[in-house]
A protein has these predicted regions:
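Loop-to-transmembrane helix entry/capping segments in MFS-fold secondary transporters
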Residues: 81-85, 174-183, 297, 384-394
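Helix-to-loop junctions at the C-terminal end of transmembrane segments
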Residues: 101-116, 314-327
Length: 444
């Protein structure tokens, strides 16, 4: 489940969504330009762990609020009967900010990498902005203040998320991208669980924002340290660096060169993240109004933990298996179909046990998908020198669902059809996502 990214890759995402999302390919799967990291020296377990911790930090900062902190805070600042619309407005505006910020951060990181051989200044700047947003949310006592704080959180943390996704394209050999991409997905899952646990542990109150404001920078330090030795011009063996072209290169349309398969991979990521956004947006209220949970925050935590533990286990196994088999599409297909079945079951659920069964299916589906998502999306990149920009655009597929989901969900949940219609629509979207794999020819 996700972000959200973002969050970014995916994402993830997703995630990666994900931020975003946040990949491996055989020689037959990639163009020569996309395959340039193939000769990079292998990354170690420590580097992959540091990358994963960075993703955990970003997604905890996104999904602790999305799962519990924002809905609970909206209850305190909104008039009776307006909480659904107020939450949709806050989340939607934040997602719109993310939508714009994600590709811009990616483009900026590309230009910084060309000049300095590292993307880390984007991590520093984005983290600082995101922490300011968390402090604003801690003090917020009105809807506008919450919008401002959440917008800063989305704006800021999309910076490090964009860098984390791009580092896979920069540093990881193609033979390791399945496992690296799956750990990117696992980081999203652990971040969602961690953020939710933190939010529940502090009693669903605004103190959770301060805890995240301290924890997020601490976890992001790991990738800054781990990547320091590699942060030299083309130390990954990707060939000679193209010279910087100044402002003209930044705005040139020629710098953006998506392939047809990139477009299908983008749509696949978008649709899967949309199903996830539909699930998460009103989960708190669904468990309250339809299921009648006595401890709503605790029930959200229970559903989240069940879903995401299964996702994490499945994603890790899927990434390793896809590297060995050099097959990605079959895992993504199984993930989309499992998600569809889980959402259909959720549409019929009125008891906690049935919700838990649906959560297990959704966890399985999300794990299968994010285990190969990053591998699929990076195998379609057309140009190594614009990987940050292209992955930034790919991370829009993590954040755009956060804009679309409120617009789609709010009218459904207040209609006579209610939550069954919402989750039924989500199941249909998952089936359409599965169909996107048919024209995705360059990925096996």
């Amino acid at each position: 489940m996700t972000e959200a990214d973002p969050p970014a890759g995916n994402r993830p995402a997703g995630t990666p969504h994900a931020g975003a999302s946040p990949a491996a390919a055989t020689p037959a799967e990639t163009s020569p330009a996309a395959a340039t990291p193939a000769d990079a020296r292998p990354v170690g377990a420590g580097w992959i762990l540091a990358l994963t911790l960075g993703v955990v930090a970003v997604f905890a900062s996104w999904f602790g609020p999305l799962q519990i902190l924002l809905p609970a805070q909206v209850d305190l600042v909104s008039a009776p009967g307006t909480r659904e619309g107020q939450l949709a407005l806050i989340v939607g505006i934040g997602a719109a900010v993310s939508l714009v910020a994600t590709p811009i951060w990616g483009l900026i990181s590309d230009r910084i990498r060309v000049r300095l051989g590292t993307r880390m200044p984007v991590v520093y700047a984005g983290t600082a902005i995101g922490v300011v947003g968390q402090v604003v949310l801690f003090t917020a006592d009105s809807g506008p203040a919450m919008i401002a704080g959440w917008g800063l959180v989305q704006l800021g943390f999309n910076g490090p998320f964009a860098v984390l996704a791009a580092l896979i394209a920069d540093r990881v050999p193609t033979a390791q991208r399945g496992i690296a991409g799956s750990m990117f997905g696992v980081g999203q899952i652990v971040g969602v669980i961690g953020g939710t646990v933190i939010a529940e542990a502090v009693g669903s109150g605004p103190l959770g924002y301060l805890v995240l404001a301290v924890l997020t920078p601490v976890l992001l330090v790991a990738i800054v340290v781990a990547d320091r030795g590699r942060a030299t011009a083309k130390s990954d063996g990707a060939g000679p660096r193209q010279p910087a072209a100044g402002k003209r290169a930044v705005i040139s349309v020629r710098r953006f060169q998506p392939t047809r398969d990139y477009a299908w991979a983008w749509l696949l990521r978008f649709l899967m993240n949309l199903t996830n956004a539909i699930l998460l947006l009103y989960l708190y209220y669904f468990l309250d109004e339809v299921v009648g949970a006595t401890d709503v925050a605790g029930s959200v935590l229970m559903v989240t933990v069940i879903t995401l533990i299964l996702s994490a286990v499945c994603a890790g196994a899927t990434g390793a298996a896809s590297d060995r088999l050099t097959r990605r599409r079959v895992f993504a297909l199984a993930g989309a179909l499992s998600t569809a079945v889980g959402l259909l079951l959720l549409a019929a659920a009125t008891t906690i046990p049935l919700v838990m069964i649906a959560a297990a299916l959704l966890g399985l589906g999300w794990g299968l998908f994010i285990g190969v998502d990053m591998a699929i999306i990076t195998s379609t990149l057309a140009d190594d020198t614009t990987s940050g920009t292209l992955l930034g655009v790919a991370n829009i597929a993590n954040s755009l669902p956060q804009v679309v989901a409120p617009a789609l969900a709010a009218p459904l949940v207040v209609s006579a059809a209610g939550y069954p219609a919402l989750y039924g629509v989500g199941a249909a979207i998952a089936v359409v996502a599965a169909l996107c794999l048919i024209p995705l020819r360059s990925v096996r």
